[in-house]
Amino acid sequence: MKKRIACLLSFLLSLYTCTALARHQQLMHNVYDTQESQSKVNEILSAVSFHGNELSYGERIAEISSRFLGTPYQAHTLIGSSLMQERLVTNPSTVDCFTFIDYVRSMAHASSWQTYVSELVKTRYTNGMIDFTGRKHFFTDWAVTSPRNAQDVTQDISPYTITVNKRLNQKNK
């Protein structure tokens, strides 16, 4: 009986490993980046790792975001629409206000290029699926869709707030 359980566990572990590897390969195939992008991310991650575990999360955010000072602004850097397949773009050499936040948050949770890419998917897309309709197009999406990357503190700031649910510019296929 123990031998059967061990074989079953071994099989399940192998299956999980193969599935995870296939998902990682599919993810990396769908990444739109450049050697310059990888170099910049690795440079920032290296600078942050220099401090080891001494930095709080807020200090990590401050350290990473300071590395973007002087980075040129560029709108419409992401690839994907209702007519074009979504690609995971990572180009920290030019940012808009949203990609800046995506990159900083993702780097704050990463220790390598691979973990950065995984974190970017979790940050930018609902349920980690690279898809235009699942992209978090609005900052409020960070507080209400999984995984949650932000917390709505509006009611903590003022007792006079009201909640109004509206469907604004919902992206469709």
Question: How would you name each of these model-derived features?
Answer:
Residues H24-T99:
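Cationic-aromatic interfacial patches
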